[in-house]
Amino acid sequence: MDSSDALMARFLALHPRTIDLSLGRIERLLARLGHPERKLPPVIHVAGTNGKGSTIAFMRAILEAAGLAAHVYTSPHLVRFHERIRIGAIGGGQFVPEDQLADALARCESANEGEPITVFEITTAAALLLFSEIPADVLLLEVGLGGRVDATNVIDRPAAAVVTPIGRDHAEYLGDTVEAVATEKAGIFKKDCPAIIAAQDYAEADAVLCRLAEAAGANPIRVGNQDFSVHAERGRLVYQDDTDLFDLPKPRLNGRHQFTNAGTAIAALRAAGFGDIGTAAIEAGLNNVEWPGRLQRLNRGRLSELVPQGSELWLDGGHNVDGGRILAAAMADLGERSDVPLVLIVGLLGTKDAEGFLRNFVGLARVLFAVPIANQMAARPAEEVAQIAAEVGLVAQAASSVEAALESLSDIVFEQPPRILICGSLYLVGAVLTANGTLPV
């Protein structure tokens, strides 16, 4: 049997574009496969600009702590392709084994009969095929891009549809206004299904989501609208809805935004029919959750050995303007607890708003090193990122690699060991985890 990598190489030749948002091709393929999308466990469908993966990670951790099996489909992967598909099992799921993935992809290739289809579409079909054949209690399904015409939007009646915070990203596909992006995300709302709307950073996004949820005949459940609320109190997470109030531990994932994501996850599970999950399982989920590359502290590994003694090394895949704002706020919160100089190591794609992203760190970062992202044709040259950073008011210089940037820190005199944040791209995150020898599991 061909490996999944060999199959992917062939799939790339089946469509001239990596992204082509429509449902016709995947609906045709799913019909030929016997409609696996109709044979799934209850589905919680998740869209949004920021926080989708973290919200799913919280849900999975809580479900597994409750003794339930949760299938998970997310994208993109960080290092290895099979990270996108997690097969649920009681006691904890695992990434789909290579032989199972290759078999499912081969079956999809055969059913597709050489017709045009994108890699994401055929991967989604393979994931749904696997999930339909392996029993589980729930499927946590992340939208790839947008929602309305995303390949995952083939579930007629999800147990719940969730939209996490919306911002401006992927304007070439979703539109260049928050309202346009919200309209695409709201396309996952379905008649008579709960529509969980997380706290939004933009009032216009919240208004569009609520209006379109009602227009779809969904049952909107909004944070802060007497449906549910979540806030930090004395370093703990307080969640309240129309039936319960939970005083919970601080989420293990770092950053104030993770309180919002955790609360959204709890609301989604309760709306989707998992309201009998007890406080102990919720607490265990918040304490044990993992989501690599999102404010992840690297305490061991090859790269962590390159930093000055006593330094902190952090990694985050934030890459859009709002992601940068969230990330800067998290770094500022850490800075309030200890006045440690912040060093940024940044790699960005050319499709992202580099100026908007970097401006969030003005007055916060002591120095920035711009680095290339290997094997990414769309990556901005490091020299260009450094120039943009300097133009917005950051002290910046280019480095040939993350390793070179880390090694050069020994030439800078800091009053105390610095806090180092590598950020700007999930592709960069994958490269860093690989170089550090700490792959996602």
Question: What does each model-identified segment do?
Answer:
Residues 17-19, 23, 27-41, 65-156, ...:
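ATP-dependent carboxylate-amine ligase catalytic core
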Residues 115, 135-143, 158-249, 262-284:
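Acidic, Mg2+-coordinating active-site environments of NTP-dependent enzymes
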Residues 1-50, 54-69, 79, 194-202:
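N-terminal leader/targeting and accessory segments in enzymes
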Residues 200-221, 231, 270, 309-315, ...:
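C-terminal helical cap/extension that packs against the catalytic core
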Residues 72, 222-223, 297, 398-399:
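A structural preference for short, hydrophobic beta-strand core positions in alpha/beta folds
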Residues 40-42, 133-134, 138-141, 149-162, ...:
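Nucleotide phosphate-binding/pyrophosphate-handling subdomain across enzymes
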Residues 425:
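Active-site-proximal loop/hinge segments that shape catalytic or ion-binding/gating pockets
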